[in-house]
Amino acid sequence: DGSYTYAADQTAADNIAAGESQSDVFVYTMTDGTENVSANITITVLGANDNPSAQNDVGVINEGGTLTVQNGDNANVSGSYDANGENSGDVIDTTSSSHKDTDLDTSDTLSITKIKKSGGSDSNVSSGSSYNSSGTAVTGTYGTLTIGADGSYKYVAQSDIAGLNDGATVTDTFTYTLSDGTATTTADITITVIGGAASNNSPSAVNDTDAVNEDATITKTGAQDDVLNDDSDSDG
């Protein structure tokens, strides 16, 4: 009877940028029982802006160390760690298949626009910045993260984290906002800090005083009289 339906292929249509269009053409044949004639059905599919996709990032660092994550837009960077806890990679890596933030609209430019620590408020990230040039610094629980709009970042862990024993771990989490200029999405950067023997926290000693008569002997016993009673160590 000539009626028809058309369902766009979402996977193929995702590659059409906003403001652009592509056409699907179908040829049909009509007959009156004696003669046949052909004509076209042309469907124009209009592109729309697709949201960017942000991937969660993780890092591992020793207590008191520095984690530097470079921008990898011009190099294939996967995010490997060396023995010192330093990383090569970045939040926005358009070349690596194992670690990347993406946008189906290939003409869009991705950038980081906001950053915040877990439970904190957003701080704006300057356009065109990198971690070492006009980057935005956010102080977390166990260190400070500095991030740029290009996705590069640097995390410096505190050198004396109270209660962090050798081999024990704590995590600092930050949430970044990824923008393609129109739409935004968010993901996390989670840094694991490992306590080390070299960064063992020093104990705290408190001066003790007492009095004794001339030619007498003073003896202290029991928990209340122990000179260690008012001394402490944050490592437990």
Model-flagged regions — what are they?
Residues 53-138, 199-236:
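Extracellular ectodomain surface segments
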